[in-house]
């Protein structure tokens, strides 16, 4: 068996782990994602009632509970709703806005995000 060399190992194939893996791979890194469950991204399939509400256009501070509001401001300034939409569009997943602020894949199926 040939030994594999990776630049980055990501533990967990949930939404954050998979986004981190895509981001690292885009930078040219060799990435390994480890997941202990049988299926990667299983929780993604349940979001948005099976349609994958992957971001929300209303990112007002009052929508977040945190003892440090500056932390939320910093996070949202670093990766906004528009950044999330762009990330998925680059993967070929076009957004549709429903219920005023919720963003879903145009396909209407969470499996298209997985």
Where are these regions (language model features)?
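Beta1/beta-strand and adjacent pyrophosphate-binding region of the FAD-binding site
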Residues: 2-16, 32
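Short, contiguous strand/loop micro-motifs
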Residues: 7-8, 70-74, 103-104
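Glycine-rich FAD pyrophosphate-binding loop
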Residues: 9, 25-49
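Small-residue (primarily alanine) positions within well-ordered alpha-helices
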Residues: 13-16, 20-25
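General structural feature for long, well-ordered alpha-helical segments within catalytic domains
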Residues: 20, 29, 36, 112-113
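Short glycine-/small-residue-rich flexible loop motifs, especially phosphate/cofactor-binding loops
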Residues: 21, 73, 85-86
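N-terminal glycine-rich dinucleotide-binding loop that anchors FAD/FMN and/or NAD(P) in oxidoreductases
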Residues: 45-78
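Feature captures the FAD/FMN-dependent oxidoreductase FAD-binding
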Residues: 78-114
